[in-house]
A protein has these predicted regions:
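DNA-contacting interfaces and partner/effector-binding or oligomerization modules
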Residues: 1-24, 32
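Nucleic acid-binding interface residues in structured DNA/RNA-binding domains
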Residues: 5-13, 55, 64-165
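Compact structured core domains
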Residues: 20-69
Length: 165
């Protein structure tokens, strides 16, 4: 059985998708790369993973580093999963670059280097926005680039984290 739930964040409406056991997607309704899903296949219900997700988001948007993470289940290629795994290690209030993530992936795979563009593609298709902090990835020149939820949201979240670091 598939479930969904709507969350009203300070940055706009978000949709949670998942099962009784896991959160599988969290996204802004208007973001690029939002998953397409058949609404008829989802029951609108507050599940255990969604309750934990709401606690996490409430803490986050109140300027606190969340202390509990919802159980997540990621679907994607091995490459994307490895990028998403690295994203989860970026500390609250800090940033990294696409190139730095590429170097980590290359090292994991025993390669000399990895394309920052390939990393950017995986980052841009992160299924669990905010909790898997793709908004903490910036360009090598320090500029804010490419957040599926929009640059203004990315700036808001980075400013929020910097203020409460």
């Amino acid at each position: 059985m598939n479930y969904k739930y709507t969350y009203e964040s300070p940055l706009g409406t978000m949709i949670m998708l998942g099962t009784l056991t896991y959160l599988t997607d969290l996204f802004f309704v208007d973001e690029a790369h939002a998953p397409s899903y058949d609404d008829a296949e989802y029951i609108e219900q507050l599940t255990g993973p969604f309750e934990v997700t709401i606690m996490w988001l409430d803490q986050y948007f109140n300027g606190k580093k969340p202390f509990i993470t919802p159980p997540i289940q990621l679907e994607g290629t091995e490459f994307r999963k490895s990028v998403w795994s690295i994203l989860q290690t970026i500390p609250y209030g800090e940033t990294t670059t696409y190139g730095d993530i590429g170097k980590k992936i290359a090292k994991q795979q025993g390669k000399d280097r990895m394309s920052a563009q390939a990393v950017g593609g995986a980052v841009g298709h992160n299924p669990i926005s905010i909790i898997i902090p793709c908004h903490r990835v910036i360009g090598s020149n320090g500029k804010l680039t490419g957040y599926a939820g929009g640059i203004e949201r990315k700036k808001y979240m980075l400013d929020l984290e910097a203020k409460h670091k």
